UniProtKB/Swiss-Prot annotation:
<dbReference type="InterPro" id="IPR023148">
    <property type="entry name" value="tRNA_m1G_MeTrfase_C_sf"/>
</dbReference>
<dbReference type="InterPro" id="IPR029026">
    <property type="entry name" value="tRNA_m1G_MTases_N"/>
</dbReference>
<dbReference type="InterPro" id="IPR016009">
    <property type="entry name" value="tRNA_MeTrfase_TRMD/TRM10"/>
</dbReference>
<dbReference type="InterPro" id="IPR002649">
    <property type="entry name" value="tRNA_m1G_MeTrfase_TrmD"/>
</dbReference>
<comment type="subunit">
    <text>Homodimer.</text>
</comment>
<dbReference type="GO" id="GO:0002939">
    <property type="term" value="P:tRNA N1-guanine methylation"/>
</dbReference>
<feature type="binding site">
    <location>
        <position position="113"/>
    </location>
    <ligand>
        <name>S-adenosyl-L-methionine</name>
    </ligand>
</feature>
<protein>
    <recommendedName>
        <fullName>tRNA (guanine-N(1)-)-methyltransferase</fullName>
        <ecNumber>2.1.1.228</ecNumber>
    </recommendedName>
</protein>
<comment type="function">
    <text>Specifically methylates guanosine-37 in various tRNAs.</text>
</comment>
<keyword id="KW-0963">Cytoplasm</keyword>
<feature type="binding site">
    <location>
        <begin position="133"/>
        <end position="138"/>
    </location>
    <ligand>
        <name>S-adenosyl-L-methionine</name>
    </ligand>
</feature>
<dbReference type="GO" id="GO:0005829">
    <property type="term" value="C:cytosol"/>
</dbReference>
<dbReference type="Pfam" id="PF01746">
    <property type="entry name" value="tRNA_m1G_MT"/>
</dbReference>
<dbReference type="GO" id="GO:0052906">
    <property type="term" value="F:tRNA (guanine(37)-N1)-methyltransferase activity"/>
</dbReference>
<keyword id="KW-0808">Transferase</keyword>
<keyword id="KW-0489">Methyltransferase</keyword>
<keyword id="KW-0949">S-adenosyl-L-methionine</keyword>
Length: 249
């Protein structure tokens, strides 16, 4: 996967390129990240990239010309058909389904806004999709872009040592993840559930599904409304709910 990033602060992306799973993916040649700074496309000595909005109001907007030229440069560098994304609070909220959808693209250009945003005509003429990471305000699009890169790159074949890790993560099947345990077997008097030490893979899978369903019911019940549970899942959830209510008495 190739990702081009348009940002006034390209140095921020070293946290993605130099560390963690994404860094390893780059070293393996599975992921490529290039950055373009609109300041490099200005024509004045101050390298101006912002201007006042028509109609007045607080704040500034990113100027059209440097931003458009940076996008053009990124398009020209892209190895193939490219989807251009603007990270924006007005965009579609990123969730696991959206991550998997974006992961089907081989090439992405991510535009990171600053100040009060960008000229609407840039969005209309240059942007294919707008995406948001939530209903809250940030100072720029860099952190959302890094979030998108991190989550999407997990679905690039070979990036994770075990692709099942991505498929079994929270939200991958619409549910929250089940609890996980490692050594020591007893910690502060609390033991690892015996089923996980049984070696019975069928029982372990059943326990994990039950816990996943139960945790979703407890913490994010609205997610269950979007799912068509199997008969077995319905039974497991009912069993969890019954036990939870008995334990709370």
């Amino acid at each position: 996967m190739w990702v081009g990033v348009i940002s006034l602060f390209p140095e921020m992306f070293r946290s993605v390129t130099d560390f963690g799973v994404t860094s390893q993916a780059i070293k393996k040649g599975l992921l490529s990240i290039e950055t373009w700074n609109p300041r490099d496309f200005t024509h004045d000595k101050h390298r101006t990239v912002d201007d006042r909005p028509y109609g007045g109001g607080p704040g500034m907007l990113m100027m059209v010309q440097p931003l458009r030229d940076a996008i053009t440069a990124a398009r020209e560098a892209s190895p193939g058909k490219t989807k251009v994304i603007y990270l924006s609070p007005q965009g579609r909220t990123l969730n696991q389904a959206g991550v998997e959808e974006l992961a089907t693209n081989e090439n992405l250009i991510l535009i990171c806004g600053r100040y009060e945003g960008v000229d609407e005509r840039i969005i209309q003429s240059e942007v294919d999709e707008e995406w948001s990471i939530g209903d809250f305000v940030l100072t720029g699009g860099e952190l959302p872009a890094m979030t998108l890169i991190d989550s999407v790159s997990r679905f690039v074949p070979g990036v994770l040592g075990d692709f099942a890790s991505a498929e079994e993560d929270s939200f991958a099947d619409g549910l929250l993840d089940c609890p996980h345990y490692t050594r020591p077997e007893v910690l502060d008097g609390k033991e690892v559930p015996s089923v996980l030490k049984s070696g019975n893979h069928k029982d372990i899978a059943r326990w994990r599904m039950k816990q996943s369903l139960g945790r979703t019911w407890l913490r994010r019940p609205e997610l269950l409304g979007n799912l068509a549970l199997t008969d077995e899942q319905e039974l497991l959830l009912a069993e969890f709910v019954r036990e939870e209510r008995q334990n709370s008495k």
